[in-house]
A protein has these predicted regions:
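RNase H-like, Mg2+-dependent phosphodiesterase core
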Residues: 1-173
């Protein structure tokens, strides 16, 4: 059976990130969260989120009883780069993949729940806010209280905070 690994939240201004693993044939799943603090200050600069993501996938591998003969389709995103490298080095059948369908939808749903648990809003409010520009406007309406939800480690955050327009694709660089 195939196991898929996907993330959600890596490119979002607000919140941490969610990592999901799902065995396609049985729909067994494992979900882990990378807290927003991993994307702030020195933790972001040292890329503390990468080993955290690897720990989540290791825990998920145990929970799902992952075997080395199962193909592991891992999303192409940077946040999963250490996972791809480590699993491949350990002899797992890692396949770089664009994850779509049920696993991607699960990742998105879990990320929305993550933001709601953080206090960003109800699930419905978060769904309406979802998107770079909407999140930025929401944060800037009360930046003193809401900056704690932001990936402040992004180089662009100081400029975004004062209202400078930046291409969302370049904001986390």
């Amino acid at each position: 059976m195939v196991v898929e690994v996907d993330d959600s939240g890596w490119g979002d201004l607000v919140g941490g990130a969610v990592i999901v693993m799902r065995r396609v044939g049985t729909n067994d799943k494992f979900v882990g969260e990378v807290p927003v603090e991993e994307f702030q200050g020195s933790a972001f600069k040292s890329k503390a989120y990468l080993p955290h993501v690897l720990r989540i996938v290791r825990e998920g591998s145990v929970a799902l009883n992952l075997t080395k003969d199962e193909p592991v389709h891992v999303c192409t995103g940077y946040i999963l780069s250490e996972v791809r490298r480590s699993l491949a080095n350990e002899g797992y059948r890692v396949i770089l993949s664009k994850i779509t369908g049920v696993t991607q939808e699960l990742a998105e749903e879990e990320y929305i729940k993550h933001l709601s648990r953080l206090g960003v809003g109800t699930i419905d409010q978060v769904k309406r806010l979802r998107g770079f520009d909407s999140f930025l406007k929401w944060v800037l309406r009360d930046v003193d209280k809401r900056e704690r939800f932001v990936k402040t480690g992004w180089k662009a955050w100081p400029r975004l905070k004062v209202g400078e327009k930046i291409d969302p694709k370049q904001a986390r660089d």
